[in-house]
Each structure stands twice: as structure tokens, then as C-alpha cells.
Amino acid sequence: MRRIGLVEMNAEQSYLKLLETLSQRKKTGDSFELAGLAMGGAWITERLAADLNLAHFGVINVAFHRDDYAEKGMTALRTASMMPTSLPFEVNGANIILIDDVLLTGRTVRAALNELFDFGRPAQVELMVLADRENRELPISADFVGEQVNVPGNQILVLEKDDAGKFRFQLEERAE
């Protein structure tokens, strides 16, 4: 993929908005578990868990539940081996917030729900995303959104983090 450049969106500011939302929720005594979608969502979740002083967080790898698994092939397998699903909490009856970097079609979230339900039956599942591109193919929406962004269909947002752990989005051309 060819890198086009930085996106107008301030990913770090959007992260802080989501952190504040969860901080307020934690102050009310509301219990929840965080589970990030590999890769970008897991980075966000790891940082949220640290900033909120949470004992643990989960990672969900959707590789084996993707509806385009046949197309992704070895790429999906590499992702699954680099960051496998790990849920260090009881899923049954839990209030779980799924976290991802970008919401576009909803297909990755559908795959994440399938993977999550392989581990149990949560009481509630909410979705938090850093960027919402608003181009659904499935009836899925986020409960918490850092920022809504407009990006041409032939481009993708790629979350990056610097050495200090700060986030930014790069814009790349979609591979055909």
C-alpha cells in the first residue's frame, strides 16, 4: 500500500475523549471489562487499561471469524499468531466494551462478536471506536466514538503509535 499522508483527525485528542468517557463511567462504580480488537484496538485498550489503572484487559483476534478469510489467507494466520485472543476475565455475565481503531463496514465487529461468544455469554456488549467512517454494510453502530471522519473509499486509515505511545492515523491507498 502506498502511504498518502497524515489525516486531519487528531487521533490523540480522540483517544483522550474516550479515556474521559471511561474515567467518568468508572467513577460511578459501573463495572466493565475492556477487550480490544487486534491490532489497533488492542493498542488502544492496553493504553486505556493503564491510564484507568485496570488490573487487566482482553484482546480479541477476529482472524478465524472473518467472512473474507479465504481472501486473507496467510495474512489472517500471521495476525492470529502475533496477537491471539486472550480474555483474562469471566465473559459470562460481564459488561464488555469492545474497542477498535476504525469502524467502517461493521464486518470486523461482527467477527469479534462471534469470537467473543465462543468464550461465553456477556450480559452486555458495547462498542467504542477511535474513528467512525460511517459506511456500514451491516447494522452495527458504535456506542462511543472518538471522531467521525470522511475518507474516500479507495483509502484506509492506519493507526500508528510513536515511541511515547501517542496515536496518529496515516492515510494509505487501499490495495486492490
Predicted regions and their residues:
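Residues at the starts of beta-strands that form the adenosine-phosphate
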Residues: 31-33, 56, 95, 124-127
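Internal catalytic-core helix/loop-beta-alpha segment
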Residues: 84-117
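PRPP-dependent phosphoribosyltransferase catalytic core
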Residues: 2, 114-176
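Active-site-facing substrate-recognition patch
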Residues: 1-31
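Substrate-recognition/cap helix-loop segment adjacent to the acidic, metal-dependent catalytic center
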Residues: 46-58
